Amino acid sequence: MLLETQDALYVALELVIAALSVAGNVLVCAAVGTANTLQTPTNYFLVSLAAADVAVGLFAIPFAITISLGFCTDFYGCLFLACFVLVLTQSSIFSLLAVAVDRYLAICVPLRYKSLVTGTRARGVIAVLWVLAFGIGLTPFLGWNSKDSATNNCTEPWDGTTNESCCLVKCLFENVVPMSYMVYFNFFGCVLPPLLIMLVIYIKIFLVACRQLQRTELMDHSRTTLQREIHAAKSLAMIVGIFALCWLPVHAVNCVTLFQPAQGKNKPKWAMNMAILLSHANSVVNPIVYAYRNRDFRYTFHKIISRYLLCQADVKSGNGQAGVQPALGVGL
């Protein structure tokens, strides 16, 4: 089947985003795995975020391409393709929320931080968050789906019979996942509240940090440490802001589709494609932010690329090691 120009451009851009997402986020995982200075509880949550972004490139984007082209498949196969990206999105949101709480504890209760936040606890939290993400993302399999309307409009059965369970449906997102689920449960219930909580947390972090910096009795070492923590919080708040900017357009389109059905039916395909591309492009951004904002990540990225891709000798930093400060706590 020949693709229209618009569809061909969409597929090409999705493939570019997928390649960049996988490459960049595998690099993040490798950096944390190989550099001792990057192995902190905060970065374990960032690895969880990177793992979700790798899965976006490997699975969610190919699934999105399949759905955009409207191939015919059985209902539950199409529903799985549609729901898988919801699992990854929810995992990303939970990982960002965990990072925000982690930074809040680091700045607001610094003396208890190391005893409260350990690597083992961080890994346990990550496991729980992924289980919750799968539960939320796969909720349509419990019945909140469009099976009745989809099978009433099936194209053809698998074996030429009229058996509804074997019915082939045109695999489009809106054919299998109801907008009521996407807006009321997914957006209003599972996306917007964590984003608002993160906004409150980061505002609180900056207020507390600024108040502490104004204390004249603060020792030079404590002041430097606090400035690093503020720098880290700014970097992570930037990641949350970019996430919101990338994902809110597609949720806005879903809201229009649900609350203004007439306009929703007539929405241009290119607008929906652009919103989807923007949401997927978010998976490319985080490694760029890490490299730009953090010396340890930047050095380790350079070291990995030089050693394994360019087959060059190890890169040496000024002191012969991959930075000396905790990740995301180093000023540039």
From Swiss-Prot:
UniProt-annotated glycosylation sites, renumbered to this chain: N153, N163
Cytoplasmic side: 34-43, 102-121, 204-235, 292-332
Superkingdom of origin: Eukaryota
Keyword vocabulary terms for this entry: Cell membrane, Disulfide bond, G-protein coupled receptor, Glycoprotein, Lipoprotein, Membrane, Palmitate, Receptor, Transducer, Transmembrane, Transmembrane helix
Residues with lipid group (S-palmitoyl cysteine): C311
InterPro entries: Adeno_A2B_rcpt (IPR001435), Adenosn_rcpt (IPR001634), GPCR_Rhodpsn (IPR000276), GPCR_Rhodpsn_7TM (IPR017452)
GO CC list: glutamatergic synapse; plasma membrane; presynapse; Schaffer collateral - CA1 synapse
Membrane-spanning intervals of the chain: 9-33, 44-67, 79-101, 122-144, 179-203, 236-259, 268-291
SMART domains: 7TM_GPCR_Srsx
Alphabetized GO MF terms: G protein-coupled adenosine receptor activity; G protein-coupled receptor activity
The family this protein is said to belong to: Belongs to the G-protein coupled receptor 1 family.
Function: Receptor for adenosine. The activity of this receptor is mediated by G proteins which activate adenylyl cyclase.
Protein name: Adenosine receptor A2b
Organism annotation: Homo sapiens (Human)
